């Protein structure tokens, strides 16, 4: 009986691991699909290109620094990145309907959350702020971001700002 329970536990753990691994992969594949879709709008392409760039940066920096990160880390970052970008779009639209000043406030909340929650403390500010410094982008966020912390901060501040 103990062997059966232990076997079931191992099986459940491996299934959970496979499901968790797929979150990062799913976010990445979904973004790639939109970027490569000739029917996608410029807005959709730009937003999903940012997601790909941010995920590539994350992976590159983990490898470059020889860090050991588990699948939970990558999955959490990918899901929080997606939630961050989606909530930004929704809250920016809500703010736009209130006033130009409120729109600017929401934009600053999200941009600051990405800039002031670094994951790697990368000194190459030109690279990590390439989207922040691009005044035409729909995703003015820093690449060197801990997306879980940034999402928590931005969500809390945006909710208060939009009351």
Residues covered by each model-derived region:
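Short, charged, amphipathic alpha-helical segments
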Residues: 44-53, 71-75, 103-108
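Intrinsic low-complexity, intrinsically disordered segments enriched in polar/basic residues
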Residues: 3, 21, 68-69, 84
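Bacterial Sec-dependent N-terminal signal peptides
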Residues: 1-24
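Immediate post-signal-peptide N-terminus of mature secreted/exported proteins
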Residues: 21-68
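Charged, low-complexity interaction regions
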Residues: 36-46, 63-72, 95-100, 118-119, ...
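Surface-exposed, polar helix/loop patches in the mature regions of secreted/periplasmic/lumenal proteins
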Residues: 74-163
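Compositionally biased non-globular segments, especially hydrophobic aliphatic-rich helices
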Residues: 16-19, 57, 62, 157, ...
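A general secondary-structure boundary signal
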Residues: 3, 18, 39-42, 163
């Amino acid at each position: 009986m103990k062997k059966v329970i232990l076997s079931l536990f191992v099986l459940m753990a491996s299934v959970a691991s496979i499901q968790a691994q797929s979150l990062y992969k799913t976010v990445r594949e979904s973004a790639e699909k939109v970027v490569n879709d000739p029917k996608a709008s410029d807005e959709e392409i730009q937003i999903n290109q940012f997601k790909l760039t941010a995920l590539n940066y994350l992976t590159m920096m983990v490898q470059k620094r020889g860090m050991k990160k588990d699948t939970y880390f990558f999955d959490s970052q990918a899901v929080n990145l997606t939630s961050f970008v989606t909530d930004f779009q929704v809250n920016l639209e809500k703010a736009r309907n209130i006033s130009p000043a409120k729109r600017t406030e929401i934009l600053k909340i999200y941009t600051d959350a990405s800039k002031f929650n670094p994951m790697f403390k990368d000194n190459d500010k030109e690279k990590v702020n390439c989207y922040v410094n691009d005044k035409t982008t729909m995703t003015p966020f820093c690449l060197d971001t801990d997306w879980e912390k940034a999402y928590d901060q931005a969500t809390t501040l945006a909710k208060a700002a939009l009351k």
